[in-house]
């Protein structure tokens, strides 16, 4: 009996600790980001029960054109939540993955590699070539779509600080 109570107490303590850890999750994001996560959660929660389950994941993958997702992959995704994945857990999982990263600073650092003079611009043609040929290659159509929103000077240089703002905050300027 004593060992049973001890086991119960540690479960309760673990639950309290998990709740304390996740209670701060909403302060990690701006309200607009939370709303976007809520929309993503709603898209995944196919049966609208407030919990993401295996059938929700399978149906979401199916809608994205991936029909033969291995059971192990779905199980691994669900195990990250260490229990039922409601919206708070969903947000916590993203918070843990994004914690300590400043996407804007990471993007600026990457652009600075291509701006040895430190002028805040990169050459459009050189950048286009990188996008088409390196790492996760962009299609020509994707590159043109991106350049449609990209701030450039008359010489065809990309203002990467403004582009970084667009990437991390959207193309609408706050007033």
From Swiss-Prot:
Protein name: Myosin regulatory light chain 2, atrial isoform
Keywords: Acetylation, Calcium, Metal-binding, Motor protein, Muscle protein, Myosin, Phosphoprotein, Repeat
Entry-annotated residues carrying N-acetylalanine: 2
Subunit annotation: Myosin is a hexamer of 2 heavy chains and 4 light chains.
Note: This chain binds calcium.
Taxonomic classification: Eukaryota, Metazoa, Chordata, Craniata, Vertebrata
EF-hand domain residues: 32-67, 102-137, 138-173
Modified residues (Phosphoserine): 22-23
Gene Ontology cellular component terms for the protein in this record: cytoplasm; myofibril; myosin complex
GO BP: cardiac muscle tissue development; heart contraction
Residues that, per the record, bind Ca(2+): 45, 47, 49, 56
MF (Gene Ontology): calcium ion binding
SUPFAM superfamilies with a match to the protein in the record: EF-hand
